[in-house]
């Protein structure tokens, strides 16, 4: 069974910094610690309102990350131009609404297929690996495949935030079925959103998933045990789960 990678989202390091408009804690230093602690990639989301990660953060991280940088962006001209200029290793296209606390669902790529196909081509031409953040839905996956997306990231929010075991099990089955469907089409599959130390194990056990992107849970735990241990604990958990 293939090794499962861990992408660490450091957005909330920047959230804490910006809460008091200080220069600390520094996301660039957090990325360094994360890499030293076993993170396989670093994920950041440059939102249109710059509520946490800033343009300077992205520029500095592009220069300093030694593993892989996954830049989450909305499918807007401004963001695509930033990505093509800075050339992160990977761009994950995500939906974005200004009033949301965090990304609330997957891209509706069915109704935006032509636009997204052009963006995928432009980013790929710039040497950037492209991923689409989508809900676990076979129709969305089919369109992702048809417009040339090499990677998808399945939105695990409905599973993660389920309030009862029955609902969570139904959402898990949707994710499992979607992973199998995507892999059979030749897509590479990542997953993330809302995953934590208590719900990640079943998702980590799915053999078709290559990487899990996790942020809030890791940063929250790091308050009590430190960032290195929080990352090491999560990496051990997902890799032990993958091995069974």
UniProtKB/Swiss-Prot annotation:
Binding residue positions for 1-deoxy-D-xylulose 5-phosphate: 11-12, 47, 52, 102
Site note Transition state stabilizer, residues: 153
Disulfide bonds: none
Localization, UniProt: Cytoplasm
Reaction equation(s) it catalyzes: 3-amino-2-oxopropyl phosphate + 1-deoxy-D-xylulose 5-phosphate = pyridoxine 5'-phosphate + phosphate + 2 H2O + H(+)
Broad class of enzyme this protein falls into: transferase
Gene3D superfamilies: Aldolase class I
Active-site annotation: 45, 72, 193
EC nos: 2.6.99.2
Keywords assigned by UniProt, alphabetized: Cytoplasm, Pyridoxine biosynthesis, Transferase
Residues at which 3-amino-2-oxopropyl phosphate binds: 9, 20, 194, 215-216
A single cellular component GO annotation: cytosol
Keyword Transferase attached: yes
Gene Ontology biological-process entries: pyridoxine biosynthetic process
Superkingdom per UniProt: Bacteria
Pathway(s) annotated for this protein in UniProt: Cofactor biosynthesis; pyridoxine 5'-phosphate biosynthesis; pyridoxine 5'-phosphate from D-erythrose 4-phosphate: step 5/5
Coiled coil: none
UniProt-listed Pfam families: PdxJ (PF03740)
Primary location recorded for the protein, binned into one broad class: cytoplasm
One of the record's GO molecular function terms: pyridoxine 5'-phosphate synthase activity
Subunit structure, interactors included: Homooctamer; tetramer of dimers.
NCBIfam families for the chain: pdxJ, PRK05265.1-1, PRK05265.1-2, PRK05265.1-3, PRK05265.1-5
Family in the record: Belongs to the PNP synthase family.
Record's protein name: Pyridoxine 5'-phosphate synthase
Gene that encodes the chain: pdxJ
